[in-house]
């Protein structure tokens, strides 16, 4: 039995994690949950899973949440906490051995660090933690003897493929050390909502268009990131930190079927790939169950049903966010945190219909350019949080100016 904490339990990753727990009740027990604002769903989750402690990020909802829990009438009700510090306490909850981090965006960084400092195993679905603060997170993992297991499909695929390399049992998969025999990583991308659109048609994109993914069921923010290909660009930075691979050896390839979740190329030129249906529960389960494989009743893989697998090179003009991510990763230091924060704010403003879809990379690029002269190559956690806040404010101020900028390559 594994005892788990789910951070962001009412979001897409959190709800899918709890579906897995319901399907495998003899393998997992939920001991702690955290959510942002959805107290009704959190109350329902408490009724089903009966955790020891829960936390809501919005302290203004704490009284209502406590009333909801009292009205459940369950024996041994959970401790109910509120606020950011409460989320951190839940992340480090003593009886949990594995923490699933499903909080969207950089908001998941501090809770993840709390879990690492408590020496928990981390099932990381919050890629922003490594993107913004990989240079801080990786040493913290080593220092606290905490293991980080990727819970997103691409990095889970790489993680699984690496176990086919020589001496894999001795490889430090997730602390930035290049596994023996690994030459390159090929990250697959669906191409997002606009993979079949002409570049000139992107000026007409609506929020509804951008939040409809052809293959995956995901939250709104990450679905927009998929449409801009920023999601894949961020995953390049994440792969660099997880597996120690140089940026020039990490390639993005469009794979519309989303069946091959990523590939690794070895020093002898052979390639290993991990295949499966496009279902986020697969990588989440593996991060939770590793090093074991638990039997499920999920749909079995069928190559003849798929019919064909196709690949193509991504269009750099169509997907400028991809190049911005590579550039920020190569700059290192605080630049990835600035990129991530600017993207989060730009996407938020797009979802609120304050800017157009094509302005997302424009404002990200402007923010990164403004940070070049302030780049810190050896940041601590406080430095990262400071530039994260700066970048968000900068994007908002630039949008308020109402100016249009041309992306500078």
From Swiss-Prot:
The answer to whether UniProt assigns keyword NADP to this entry is yes
**Protein residues bound to Mn(2+):** 152, 154, 235
Q: Which Gene3D superfamilies match?
A: 1.10.1740.10, NAD(P)-binding Rossmann-like Domain (3.40.50.720)
GO MF: 1-deoxy-D-xylulose-5-phosphate reductoisomerase activity; manganese ion binding; NADPH binding
State the similarity comment.
Belongs to the DXR family.
- Matching NCBIfam families: Dxr, PRK12464.1
Record-given protein name: 1-deoxy-D-xylulose 5-phosphate reductoisomerase
The taxonomic lineage of its organism, from the top, reads: Bacteria, Bacillati, Cyanobacteriota, Cyanophyceae, Synechococcales
């Amino acid at each position: 039995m594994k005892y788990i904490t789910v951070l962001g339990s009412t979001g897409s990753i959190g709800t899918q994690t709890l579906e897995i727990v319901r399907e495998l009740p003899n393998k997992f027990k939920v001991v702690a949950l955290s959510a942002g604002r959805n107290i009704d769903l959190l109350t329902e989750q408490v009724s089903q899973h009966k955790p020891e402690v829960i936390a809501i990020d919005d302290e203004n909802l704490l009284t209502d949440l406590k009333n909801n829990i009292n009205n459940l009438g369950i024996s041994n009700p959970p401790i109910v906490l509120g606020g950011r510090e409460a989320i951190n306490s839940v992340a480090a909850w003593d009886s949990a051995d594995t923490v699933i981090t499903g909080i969207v965006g950089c908001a998941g960084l501090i809770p993840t660090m709390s879990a690492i400092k408590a020496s928990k195993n981390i099932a990381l679905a919050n890629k922003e933690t490594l993107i913004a603060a990989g240079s801080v997170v990786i040493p913290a993992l080593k220092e606290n003897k905490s293991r980080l297991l990727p819970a997103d499909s691409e990095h889970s695929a790489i993680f699984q493929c690496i176990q086919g390399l020589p001496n894999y049992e001795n490889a430090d998969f997730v602390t930035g050390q290049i596994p023996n025999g690994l030459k390159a990583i090929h990250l697959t991308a669906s191409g997002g909502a606009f993979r079949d659109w002409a570049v000139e048609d992107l000026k007409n994109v609506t929020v509804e268009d951008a939040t409809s993914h052809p293959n995956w069921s995901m939250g709104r923010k990450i679905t927009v990131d998929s449409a801009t290909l920023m999601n894949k660009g961020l995953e390049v930075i994440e792969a660099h930190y997880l597996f120690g691979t140089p940026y020039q050896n990490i390639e993005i390839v469009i794979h519309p079927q989303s069946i091959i979740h990523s590939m690794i190329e070895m020093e002898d030129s052979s390639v290993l790939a991990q295949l499966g249906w496009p279902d986020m529960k697969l990588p989440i389960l593996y991060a939770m169950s590793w090093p074991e494989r638990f039997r499920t009743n999920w749909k079995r893989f069928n190559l003849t049903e798929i019919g064909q697998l196709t690949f193509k090179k991504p269009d750099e003009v169509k997907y400028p966010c991809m190049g911005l991510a590579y550039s920020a990763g190569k700059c290192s230091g605080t630049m990835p945190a600035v990129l991530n924060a600017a993207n989060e704010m730009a996407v938020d403003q797009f979802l609120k219909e304050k800017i157009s879809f094509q302005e997302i990379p424009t404002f990200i690029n402007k923010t990164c350019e403004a940070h070049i002269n302030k780049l810190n190559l050896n940041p601590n956690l406080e430095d990262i949080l400071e530039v994260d806040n700066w970048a968000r404010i900068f994007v908002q101020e630039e949008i308020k100016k109402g100016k249009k900028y041309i992306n500078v390559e």
